[in-house]
Structure formats: C-alpha cells, structure tokens
C-alpha cells in the first residue's frame, strides 16, 4: 500500500518531467539568441550609428571591450554563491537601457555609452548562462543546455542581421526602439520556460542512478529534506554533476527559496549555513593555469583568425561581376559581396554550434587545437587571394577584369568561408563542452564507491561538494573571456590589414575595394 501511495505521489513529477528537456532546450536557445542578437544588430547598424568620417571600428571596439572586461575581471573578483535571478535581472535592465540610449540619442558620445551598456550586458549574460549549464542535475542535461545555448548564439548572427535589414528603413530611433523589447524576454524565459531542476532530475530517474544515502545524523533530522545527490556506475552518457539541492541551480541563490519557488526548510537553511566554501585568489589562479593552454589559447586563436578574416580580409574579396550562373543572380553590385560572405559565415557558424543539439559527437579534447589550425590555413589562403589573386584565372587576374563569365575564385572563396564558419562554431561549442565536464562528481569516485580520500560515499562532505560546484562555475566563466579577447585582438589587426590589402589591389590595377 505504501508503495502504491509513493507511486501516486511521484506521478505528478513524472508527468511534469515529460517535456522538461524540451523546455530546457528552448530556454537556453532563447537565452543564447537574446544575449547575442543585440550585439549583432548594433554591428549591423554601425554605418547608421556614426558619421561618415568616424571609423566604423569604433563601434566594434565599444561593442566588445566592456564584455571582455566583464568576462575577465568578474570571475576573479566575485566569490561565494552566484545569485542567478539577480544576474538575469541586471542583464535585462542593462541591455534595455543601453539600446534605448542608442535609439534616443543623436550624438556620438551617448550612443557609445549605450553600446557599452549593451556590451556589458552581453558579457555578463554569456558568463551567467554558461555557468548555469554547469549546475544542472546530470551531464546529459548540461550537454542539452550547452548545445541549445550554442545554437542560440549561432542563430543570433543570422537573426540579428535579418532583423536590422528589415528595420533599417525605420531609422536608428525606430529600428532600435522596436528592438528594445527583446531583452524583456530574459526574465520571461527564466521564470516561465526554464523548467524546475527537480523535473529534470525526475526525468533522469529511469537512468541507472541511485540516490546517495545520507549519514544518519542528517537523515534523522525531521526538518531536513535530503539533497538529491545522484550516483551511478560511471558511464559515458549520464554522469551526476553535483548535489542539485545545494548547487546554484536547484537553490536559486536566494536564502529562502529553491529553483521551484518552494520555501526552504530549517534543515535546508542549516545545511546551507554549513557551507564555508569560497574560492581564494590562490585557488582561482591554480584552477586557471591549466585552462590557459588547454582551452583558452586554442579558442582565442580561432576567434582572432576568423575575425581577421571577417573584418580585415573579407571586405577586399571583391570580384568582377559574373555574367551567368548562380553567382550572377546573387551578385548585382560589387557591394553585394561582403554581405554575402557575412551571411555565409554566420550560417555555417550556426550549423556547427548546433552540432551537439543535432546529436553529433564532440571532438576529443586532444583535438581542440584542430579548428584553430584549420582556421589559420583558411586565413592564409584568403589572404593570398586578396593579396595576389592566387585562385583567379588569368583572365581575371589584375589588371585584367575578365571578358564575361565567372571568376572561378568566387566559388573557392565561398567554400573557404563555409569552412571558416564551421571551424569557428566548432571551436566554441566543443571547448565549453569539455570545460563543463571538468571536475564532475564522477571523477572523485572509483567504481567501488570510495572517494579519492578513501572515504565511503555514504558519508557526504557537503562543503567539498559545494566547492566543486564553485570550481566548475569558475572554470567555464574564466574560459569565456578567451573569445572576446580574440575578437579584440582581431579588431586591432583588421583595420590596418584591410587598408594594406586594398592598397595592394589598387597598385595592381584592381580598384573595386575603393569603390564600395
């Protein structure tokens, strides 16, 4: 009879968990889309935001530098528990105020202030939601969330360019004013779409998990609800990551409520009070050192290379207009080349960032430098084309402009930019996938259930578990600075590189880059 009652009690949770993973995927995809779409809209609107005599690189600089500072400094300075609800609220207000400031201003200074605020929100948002993926109940749900986040950020590139293309006719005030409603979906998604983590936990009950028995001193406390610590035989798919009750996911970092909005019991609060876990500066630096070579340098290199291509080389990849075939339908003016290269790049970034969501296996950790190596080859080949017209047939090699037909180098450049997008997206999603797996609970237990310190797994060191969760949050937050660092370096390289490549083309008799 007791078993029947227990089954009836668990039925609502099992029913509620039916669509929990779908809600999780949708929530993190929306988070990724919202976090990056304003960044793309602002870059797409750069020509309209500054005067003709102001370098457009100023917009790019103010659009990336505050985000970089946030992602570099915040993980090192912040300590203790992360209050995700407050962070989401901060990102919403900061992003909305920034875009409204841009829309309602007509001079350069307040617009740059608004761009900086939007950038600050974007940096804090990426830091927050990447850290949130490490707090989910199982490795499978973390993988789902990370894949959805990556897909959303990838789609933001296509969506942002498309939104501004549709709204540009309304001008800066009208177009950006309409875009200002987008940040309001952050709290809506966080509160109403993101599922309670207990539902995600319930959806994993059919997997070979066992709840970790608590010590008698805790389990005998009538006011104490045992944390749902999940332990299983090590597997490649489902690996428990943390204690959901104590982690920053299940307890929403508010003192009196959990992620489900339920009041915490006195036992929960006492257990939270037991936590003295804080990462010292020395501990953070110890965690950071192995991340630099293993993850941050390869990711930074990928971003330097791809943004040098996008901002420094791609604007000079201009060809005589084709007179037949598909390319003649796409390119009606020399000004059509650069937007097409950008769209191609963004599309393939979206596809590669969605690889985890599409069920493709991640690349092995030892191969994480591979996207950067391939990206360097792509950069080198495109540089040669822009500098020496390496792939052009003799009829299209300057000073000749062809006598009708299609320059074969258009197709080659298109394929190389497709590869560029695949490498960039792959470097991002695979790096954060492997960073998120570091320090999981399963690494601290052997197959017999004994932990690294020789203790029985039936005795739970709550403080140590919570500290492990903080370490995972710090790792993924710290690595997040690598991409913004790469973009900043690329912007410093790209401006003089574009000028030098265009001057070289003009010297050879091809002046199209000056006529755009």
Curated annotation (Swiss-Prot):
Q: Which keywords annotate this record?
A: Amino-acid transport, Membrane, Transmembrane, Transmembrane helix, Transport, Vacuole
**InterPro entries tied to this protein:** Battenin_disease_Cln3, MFS_trans_sf
Q: Which Pfam families match?
A: CLN3 (PF02487)
* UniProt topology in membrane: Multi-pass membrane protein
Residues that span the membrane, as ranges: 24-44, 57-77, 88-108, 112-132, 146-166, 169-189, 371-391, 409-429
Q: State its role.
A: Involved in vacuolar transport and vacuole pH homeostasis. Also required for cytokinesis.
Q: Per its record, how is this protein called by name?
A: Protein BTN1
Q: Which organism's genome codes for this protein?
A: Cryptococcus neoformans var. neoformans serotype D (strain JEC21 / ATCC MYA-565)
Highest lineage ranks of the organism? Eukaryota, Fungi, Dikarya, Basidiomycota, Agaricomycotina
As recorded in Swiss-Prot or TrEMBL, the protein's gene is named BTN1
């Amino acid at each position: 009879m007791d078993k029947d009652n227990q089954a009836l009690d668990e039925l609502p949770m099992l029913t509620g968990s039916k669509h929990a993973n779908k809600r999780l995927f949708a929530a993190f995809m929306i988070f990724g889309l919202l976090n990056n779409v304003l960044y793309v809209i602002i870059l797409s609107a750069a020509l309209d935001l500054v005067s003709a005599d102001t370098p457009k690189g100023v917009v790019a600089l103010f659009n990336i530098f505050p985000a970089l500072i946030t992602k570099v400094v915040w993980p090192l300075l912040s300590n203790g528990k992360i209050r995700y609800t407050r962070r989401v609220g901060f990102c919403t207000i900061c992003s909305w105020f920034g875009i409204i400031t841009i829309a309602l201003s007509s001079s350069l200074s307040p617009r740059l202030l608004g761009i900086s605020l939007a950038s600050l929100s974007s940096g804090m948002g990426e830091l927050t939601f990447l850290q949130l993926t490490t707090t989910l109940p199982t490795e499978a749900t973390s993988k789902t969330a990370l894949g959805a986040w990556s897909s959303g950020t990838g789609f933001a590139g296509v969506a942002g360019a498309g939104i501004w293309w549709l709204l540009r006719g309304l001008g800066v005030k009208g177009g950006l004013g309409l875009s200002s409603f987008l940040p309001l979906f952050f709290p809506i998604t966080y509160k109403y779409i993101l599922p309670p983590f207990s539902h995600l936990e319930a959806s994993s009950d059919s997997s070979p998990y066992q709840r970790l028995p608590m010590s008698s001193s805790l389990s005998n406390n009538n006011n104490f609800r045992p944390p749902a610590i999940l332990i299983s035989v090590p597997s490649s798919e489902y690996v428990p990551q943390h204690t959901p009750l104590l982690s920053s996911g299940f307890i929403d970092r508010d003192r009196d409520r959990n992620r489900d909005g339920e009041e915490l019991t006195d036992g929960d609060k006492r257990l939270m009070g037991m936590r003295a876990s804080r990462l010292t500066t020395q501990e953070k630096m110890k965690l950071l050192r192995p991340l630099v070579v293993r993850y941050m340098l390869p990711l930074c290199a990928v971003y330097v290379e791809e943004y040098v291509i996008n901002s420094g080389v791609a604007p000079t990849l201009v060809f005589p207009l084709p007179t037949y075939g598909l390319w003649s339908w796409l390119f009606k003016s020399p000004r059509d080349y650069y937007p097409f290269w950008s769209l191609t790049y963004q599309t393939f970034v979206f596809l590669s960032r969605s690889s985890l969501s599409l069920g493709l296996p991640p690349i092995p950790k030892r191969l994480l430098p591979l996207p950067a190596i391939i990206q360097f080859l792509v950069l080198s080949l495109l540089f040669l084309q822009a500098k020496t017209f390496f792939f052009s047939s003799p009829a299209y090699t300057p000073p000749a402009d062809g006598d009708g037909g299609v320059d074969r180098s258009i197709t080659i450049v298109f394929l190389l930019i497709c590869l560029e997008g695949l490498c960039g997206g792959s470097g991002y999603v695979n790096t954060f996938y492997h960073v998120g797996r570091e320090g999981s609970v399963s690494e601290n237990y052997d197959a017999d259930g004994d932990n690294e310190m020789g203790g029985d797994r039936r005795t739970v060191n709550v403080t140590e578990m919570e500290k492990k969760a903080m370490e995972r949050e710090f790792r993924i937050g710290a690595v997040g600075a690598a991409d913004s660092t790469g973009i900043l370096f690329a912007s410093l390289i790209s401006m003089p590189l574009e000028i030098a490549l265009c001057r070289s083309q003009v010297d050879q008799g091809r002046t199209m880059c000056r006529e755009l």
